[in-house]
Amino acid sequence: MATGYSTGVSPFDLDENNHNDSIHHRHQNHHSQSHDSSGERDDTEIEDIIQKTSKLNINTSTSTKIKNFFFQSSNRHDSSNSPPLREVFIKTINPLILTAISSFVRLYRIDVANSVVWDEAHFGKFGSQYLKRQFYFDVHPPLGKLLIGLSGYLADYDGNFDFESSNVYPDNVNYVFMRIFNCFFGILVTPLAYKTAVILGYNQFTCWLIAFMVIFEQLSLTLSKFILLDSMLLFFTVLTMYCLVKVHTLAIARVGSNSKTPLTKLEIKWYILTGISIGCVCSVKWVGLFVTALVGFYTIVDLWIKFYQTFAIDKKSPKKMSVVNYLIHWVVRIFTLIIIPMTIYVATFKVHFMVLNHTGPDDGTLSTLLQGSLIGNDLQSGPRSVAFGSLVTIRSQGLSPNLIHSHPHNYPQGSQEQQVTTYGFKDDNNEFLFEFGVDAGLRNQHATLENENSTRNGGNDDDYYHVIIHDGDTVRINHKNTGSYLRANAVGAPITSSSYEVSCFGDVESNDWADEWVIEIQSQDQSPDPMFQDEDPSEIHSVSTSFRLKHKQLGCYLATTGKSYPAWGYQQGEVVCKYSVFSRDKNTWWNIEKHVNNKLPLPATEYVPPKPKFWKEFILLNYAMMASNNALIPDPDRFDKLSSEWWEWPILNTGLRMNSWGDADIKYFLLGNPLITWISTIALIVCPLYLLVVGIKYQRQWILLSATDTSNANPANSQSLSLLAARALLPLAGWVLHYVPFILMGRVKYLHHYVPALYFAIFVAGFIVDAILNLDFSYHNNKFQYIFKVVIYSTLYLVICISFWYFKDLSFGMEGSSVDYRHLRLLGSWMI
């Protein structure tokens, strides 16, 4: 085995000189033995043969021309010798034909279901929010939903349809245009798949096979007919793969030309396009991080090989790259593959915040300052200074910025006292009262509210206090609805056992030292209105003051963890009391949001809240998205007909009913094309075995495994390692990266999560078919091999089309009784 690396710039560009020389040496020995045994030919006889053959007029047969047209590798022909028509077909005509077929099967009957289908109820509603400019919260990044909003805008939709599941679209909602807009992304996947196969150097029959499998793959086909994110996600995933393959092949071409420049302008262009595509795919769904990981792993291997070439770790290998050129490779990749994608991702959130500038249904999940910046917000900031007796809601400033909440349900373990949680919706169980410390309680002094919100009865005027709360004051926090006090207990919290449990306990007459908290002011945000810029910094002010609550007995701080309670806690956020060394720990920071106190004067003019900081809101929103994603766990006590498990997807053990199943409904059943899915699954099993065989043959010096193009070598004993990496390893790694994470995830899973992985599986299938049909059958002549290949490819095209035609109604919509379609139920688990 060789130990050095060649000048190749892409992964797996190994220096195989020693290995290949060994093979050539064996071939030469065999040749010399044959030559010695055969004897010398007569010179005059040789001259006679040369003269005769020179007079021959050799014409290429029609079958040979057809063979070269279809089976010549798509990226290896010399345009000066190739027929111009072939160039036109590969670059223009073939992609147009495939795009036309893809358009027909995806647009056909796209309008037939005139009601809200499946997740159109979610994403159509989010598009409406953009048109109404009302803030909302969702677990996915904004780009895909912004595009849905754009489709509604272009369709003259006003955003006032509710998109309730199964509701019929009114006449003023041009749902057909919005579906076509979404379908456009699904259509473009086909020409991208074809062009990717062309760049990989496949012959035209293999390119068409891959394109046909993509066209008639019914998971993505069905999803592309509706207002969903899946087509956009798949398109940008495919585009990223296309750009990566382009970068790979350009790098190989540069090395083959012995260029001295570290990167050509064309390579830099495609690196930039790769970065743009990564930014877009991650801005549609976080599943885009999986194809980003594929690019990342490729880049790591690439840079490691260049490091080896630059610093010549193996002393036997010469230094093949300067340090400056190596650093240039780093700079280009950091800028194009990290900075550009991150800029696009952040920019989509910037647009998201700019468009959604009105209050909406999900304000309860937002920070107080972000709510205050929304037009029409319902913040009741009340008097500027908070006093004992004030009724308040208290919001966390941690990564899960919800309101502190309690309800009359107890912990099943620990103290078994009343639960304390954080809650993302505005509710009267979020309301608390600031009460004096225990010393005042022992003197029977209680701060109360003398208004409709008060829960106290009677009393003299002397019993009412409106003393302003200052930094360092001791307070008790009383839950308004249950009358119990917020406290910390010296037992482990239910989820985060390293911190103390927080509960509510007792009543207004209780005087327990465990109920006392100390106010520690951390910061005062300044209003842009000069009238509110001279407020006392030692006082607690609603909205603008950030403070911590330190438990007086235990010395720990009231905090959120970002974790959620299980079903007994209604999946609400965990609240704990923890020791915090750093005062800047935002999980221990709180602010007053709602403030009611009729004893105190209101400001002369309406309070203008401080402006929210974009980066803070960006981080908070992304963490909230992550927390909500993690909270989407299956309920073990509930049977979910729509969800499925990861092991069911490659074998199509289950499908998914996308809408109502009545006889009067147009019914859609989400299911992959069985033939295509099963072929791709078999290929996923065969591919590692094939690569293992290639590795064994290489190790035993039975084949050449060159880093360079071997198009002119005998395919029986030579292969291009770079092409092998691009054709087999990249798609196989893409499938693994898009599939294995769902095995590890605890969240609820659905069949459509397999769509990106299936795309990579199709390319693995194309590789295996191409590899098998290009084996060197030396005992047959070339004409037989050509006919054999044509028959096999034609058969594959035919059975793919027949399979699609047989199951077409699952994607085009089933009318009438579902009984009429029971013949499509090949497996008993398919609920057709």
UniProtKB/Swiss-Prot annotation:
List GO molecular-function terms, semicolon-separated.
dolichyl-phosphate-mannose-protein mannosyltransferase activity
Query: What Gene Ontology biological process does one annotation of this record name?
Result: filamentous growth of a population of unicellular organisms
Which keywords accompany this UniProt record? Answer: Endoplasmic reticulum, Glycoprotein, Glycosyltransferase, Membrane, Repeat, Transferase, Transmembrane, Transmembrane helix
Give induction info: Expression is repressed by HAP4 and BCR1.
Q: Any idea where the MIR domain is?
A: 383-437, 466-522, 537-595
Enumerate the CDD domains for this protein.
beta-trefoil_MIR_PMT2-like
The record's EC number reads 2.4.1.109
Q: Which residues are glycosylated?
A: N20, N59, N357, N453
Family indicated by similarity? Belongs to the glycosyltransferase 39 family.
Know the name of this protein? Answer: Dolichyl-phosphate-mannose--protein mannosyltransferase 6
Organism of origin: Candida albicans (strain SC5314 / ATCC MYA-2876)
The organism that produces this protein has a lineage beginning with:
Eukaryota, Fungi, Dikarya, Ascomycota, Saccharomycotina
